[in-house]
């Protein structure tokens, strides 16, 4: 197996998901650990959300503040730590078509399965924020053409997703967004289309039926979102939930912080007891981070004199190890 084999396999897997006539649910977040959690929960792909990267790296909104190096470094870590395909949010491509060329090639080299580039003006705004403005159709098509050419020079399996933000922009309409999406595929060469801010079932169903490429969407309508079965019946290929893991983590952290301030250590005991009874309590968290691999490498390659003394020290011992003695309390003094 070569270094690139796992990367190629994940890219081919992502293309297989896009080619299937069924819905794929794609959770999103910002960290390798969240991607691993999604993998362990049985999801087939994961989204590195630019909004979450901005929030958790810098504590700022999704306004084009993160840079290419931020994205590529994070994407590389995420791709290396999980076995499912990663689609990354490359915002506007960090510039014009020339910048897009380098953005795509850096992301290809990072080992992810694909990237999305949106048609907003720079500096961009969040895909759910008011005040968005879009570049011209010609400029957008040129950016996607540049993305495809840069991709083809390195790995044609890498997926280019074109995101259309016209529906949420000033004066935008479904008719214009629909025509743009078709042009991004027909003239730009995009493999996947993200119709952003779609608000009605009728519009989404038409987009899935008539755009000549798989469609990705996030529901933005005022009425309740379609069920996953309804999405699949419409022909939607990817239902994206870009912030769900981070939102769940923030909600839990906020709850626990307030309970700790109000009740002291009792809150931690209650929280740990509840976690132990939940699905989370059944997760091997050390295995999730790769601790067994560390122990295996120590046992295989370190001299006996240099190996960590798991038997005689306090703390966690890898479950597979020979040192099975339970942790002993630390001696006072």
Which role fits each region the language model picked out?
Residues 2-8, 14, 244-333:
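Extended, intrinsically disordered, low-complexity segments
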Residues 3-217, 221-241, 248, 258, ...:
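Alpha/beta enzyme core
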């Amino acid at each position: 197996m070569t270094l690139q084999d796992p990367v190629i396999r994940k890219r081919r897997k992502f293309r297989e998901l896009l080619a299937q006539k069924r819905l794929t649910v794609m959770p999103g977040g910002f960290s390798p650990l969240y991607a691993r959690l999604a993998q362990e929960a049985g999801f087939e792909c994961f989204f590195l959300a630019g909004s979450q990267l901005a929030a958790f790296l810098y504590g700022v909104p999704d306004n084009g503040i993160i840079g290419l190096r931020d994205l590529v470094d994070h994407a590389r870590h995420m791709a290396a730590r999980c076995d499912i395909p990663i689609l990354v949010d490359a915002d506007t491509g960090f510039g014009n078509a020339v910048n897009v060329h380098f953005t795509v090639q850096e992301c290809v080299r990072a080992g992810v399965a694909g990237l999305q580039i949106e048609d907003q003006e720079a500096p961009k705004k969040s895909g759910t924020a008011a005040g968005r403005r879009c570049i011209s159709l010609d400029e957008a098509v040129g950016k996607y053409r540049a993305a495809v050419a840069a991709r083809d020079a390195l790995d044609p399996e890498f997926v280019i997703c074109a995101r259309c933000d016209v529906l949420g922009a000033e004066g935008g309409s479904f008719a214009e967004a629909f025509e743009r999406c078709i042009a991004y595929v027909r003239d730009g060469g995009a493999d996947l289309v993200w119709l952003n801010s779609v608000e009605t079932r009728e519009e989404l169903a038409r987009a899935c039926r008539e755009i000549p490429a798989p469609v990705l969407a996030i529901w933005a309508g005022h009425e309740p979102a379609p069920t996953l079965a309804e999405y699949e019946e419409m022909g939607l290929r990817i239902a994206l939930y870009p912030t769900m893991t981070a939102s769940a983590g923030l909600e839990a952290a906020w709850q626990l912080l307030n309970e700790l301030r109000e009740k002291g250590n009792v809150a931690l005991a209650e929280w740990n007891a509840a976690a132990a009874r939940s699905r989370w309590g059944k997760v091997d968290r050390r295995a999730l981070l790769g601790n067994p691999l560390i122990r295996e490498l120590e046992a295989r390659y370190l001299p006996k004199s240099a190996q960590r003394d798991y038997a005689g020290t306090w703390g966690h011992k890898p479950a597979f190890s020979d040192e099975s003695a339970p942790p002993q309390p630390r001696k006072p003094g």
